[in-house]
Design a protein with these regions (language model features):
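Extended, alpha-helix-rich binding/interface surfaces that flank or overlap catalytic cores
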Residues: 106
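Short active-site loop/helix that positions an aromatic residue
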Residues: 111-118
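N-terminal flexible segment immediately upstream of the FAD-binding catalytic core
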Residues: 1-50, 54, 66-99, 128, ...
Length: 144
């Protein structure tokens, strides 16, 4: 994994992986990942999935992993790779006419808001979070 992502994007130390456990799990069931992987591109995601498949290791994906009520970024099978898409945080396109934004999965509400303001957009953004939550994660959670 380090060859595919760089050592700084493969977390294996317990302190570095603390955000990827479920703090509300029953005692002894922390749902600890085997490693946290932080890809920064589609190609890196593909490489991670290829390697995980070759080794039969389950992958648990999250965009920000902040939804603590649902276990956050914690995998349901201990030892799984926690695949965090946080580094994929670019706003790729904003279509003013159709009121649409194309974003990578790690884009937070803060990121989209800042992009709209910096670009001079006239679009107004309704934010269902304090700002650090995931645009994509929130949309998927609510069936958009």
């Amino acid at each position: 994994m380090e060859a595919a992502l760089g050592s700084e994007n493969v977390l294996t130390q317990p302190a570095a992986m603390a955000d990827y456990g479920d703090p509300f799990a029953p005692p002894g069931e922390w749902y600890r990942p085997g490693a946290v992987l932080l890809p920064g591109s589609v190609e890196e995601v593909q490489a991670v999935l290829r390697i995980a498949n070759e080794h039969g290791t389950p992958v648990w994906t999250s965009s920000q992993g902040r939804n603590k009520g649902y276990g956050g970024g914690a995998p349901r099978v201990s030892g799984s790779f926690a695949l965090s898409l946080r580094r994929m945080n670019r706003v790729l396109e904003v279509d003013e006419e159709n009121c649409m934004a194309l974003v990578e999965p790690g884009v937070r509400f803060f990121d989209l808001y800042d992009h709209l303001r910096a670009s001079g957009s006239k679009l107004w953004m309704s934010v269902p979070d304090l700002g650090g939550g995931s645009v994509i994660g929130n949309a998927l959670e609510h069936g958009v």
